[in-house]
Amino acid sequence: NKKRLWVGTNKGLCVFYGDSIIADAHNYKLYNYENGDLPGYEIKCIFRDSQNRMWIGMLGGGFSVCNPSEDYRNLKFVHYSTTDGLVNNMVESIIEDKTGKIWIATQYGLSRFSPDTETFENFFFSASMQGNVYNEHGAAITEDGLLLFGTNHGVIVIDPLKVTSSPMTRNVILTNLKVNGITVQVGEKDSPLTQALSY
């Protein structure tokens, strides 16, 4: 953007203007874990969204976002990881759908991120574990808004308008009951249980 180049390396993110680096090979800025700018070293993907924000996916560091300024040497990043709700910190590709949501494909699962609310929804579209392992730079969007993601088992095609999140509900199962720190059984004197807990 604006002749600025963003290069992902295994040492971090390198940002520079193409013409200036020809004149001076040291005229660039390296953002990485060592200098405290990013939560990781190895950059797996770089994506510019419709708002011109830059999304940086890292191996083990989750992802970071910045609004590029003219001064490429002082970019400020906001970082997101599993602590914030991302499905996995090994980010492989990032893409935006037509509604402005950001999809983050990882080495185990897919996250849909809402930049406005900074919330995540996580998905596992394959019944097999290997089918939920996404490929590096393996994301694309079609003209009609379908998202394509490369996985270890082929391509997953997603219509973002039809994907709904269904909260998982889990049944509570009691396996043991203690009263005043002592396990009680059915049939014992003063036991509150009239039948086994498994019923």
Language-model features, listed with the residues they occupy:
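Sequence-structural signature of mature extracellular/luminal beta-sheet repeat domains
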Residues: 2-5, 15-17
